[in-house]
């Protein structure tokens, strides 16, 4: 299924995923497309931050859902 990931810059990334994919998997796909390391990615859906070990199905994320990507920058 397709889902969309919207970045803070307003860019929308389209990903091909399965409901059984973990949030880790999704972050890896974002890394493939955008080059952003997963440890800097925070994914938000319906106001909740998504935890790595959970699946899209756990959060009831269905086709054509839009997730929001927030970058967590290190230290400073």
From Swiss-Prot:
Coiled coil: none annotated. The keyword Transit peptide does not apply. There is a cross-link at residue 76 (Glycyl lysine isopeptide (Gly-Lys) (interchain with K-? in acceptor proteins)). SMART domains: UBQ. There is a cross-link at residue 48 (Glycyl lysine isopeptide (Lys-Gly) (interchain with G-Cter in ubiquitin)). It is found in: Cytoplasm; Nucleus. Keywords: Cytoplasm, Isopeptide bond, Nucleus, Ubl conjugation. Disulfide bonds: none annotated. It comes from the Eukaryota. GO terms for molecular function: mRNA binding. One of its GO terms (cellular component) is nucleus. Residues 1-76 form the Ubiquitin-like domain. Ubiquitin exists either covalently attached to another protein, or free (unanchored). When covalently bound, it is conjugated to target proteins via an isopeptide bond either as a monomer (monoubiquitin), a polymer linked via different Lys residues of the ubiquitin (polyubiquitin chains) or a linear polymer linked via the initiator Met of the ubiquitin (linear polyubiquitin chains). Polyubiquitin chains, when attached to a target protein, have different functions depending on the Lys residue of the ubiquitin that is linked: Lys-48-linked is involved in protein degradation via the proteasome. Belongs to the ubiquitin family. This is Ubiquitin. It comes from Avena sativa. The lineage of its organism: Eukaryota, Viridiplantae, Streptophyta, Embryophyta, Tracheophyta.
């Amino acid at each position: 299924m397709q889902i969309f990931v919207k970045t803070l810059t307003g860019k929308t990334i389209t990903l091909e995923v399965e409901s059984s994919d973990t949030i880790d998997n999704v972050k890896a796909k974002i890394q493939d497309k955008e080059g952003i390391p997963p440890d800097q990615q925070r994914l938000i859906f319906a106001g909740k931050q998504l935890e790595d070990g959970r699946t899209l199905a756990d959060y009831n994320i269905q086709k054509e859902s839009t997730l929001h990507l927030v970058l967590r920058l290190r230290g400073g």
